[in-house]
Amino acid sequence: MNPQIEERIQKIGERIKKEYRAERVILFGSYATGDATEDSDIDLFIVAPTKERFFQRMATVRRLIRDLRNGLPVAPIVLTAKELEKRRKAEDPFIEGVLATGIPL
């Protein structure tokens, strides 16, 4: 991964943890596997205490990191700890994949 992009991803993760009070921020997808291309987005799985509706959470995170993106597309998915646990118990293959292969930030 390009060192500048890697540094930017780390800063994005730090900001989300600090300002969105995220318990976990996990990089997944092509940037995590090393298969990213110029058309790839930065896939982030976020666990945070929030009462926002599902799609509002993503909008909030995008606004929060707007100045750090520098033109890079970011695709956040935000769940609460309770939602995550429910999906883990249901053996959701998406969640299992993110947790097994994602990179914690």
Model-inferred region functions:
Residues 43-47:
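Short beta-strand->loop micro-motif that forms the acidic, two-metal-ion catalytic signature
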Residues 30:
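Conserved H-loop
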Residues 1-24, 33-38, 48-105:
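Catalytic core of pol beta-like nucleotidyltransferases
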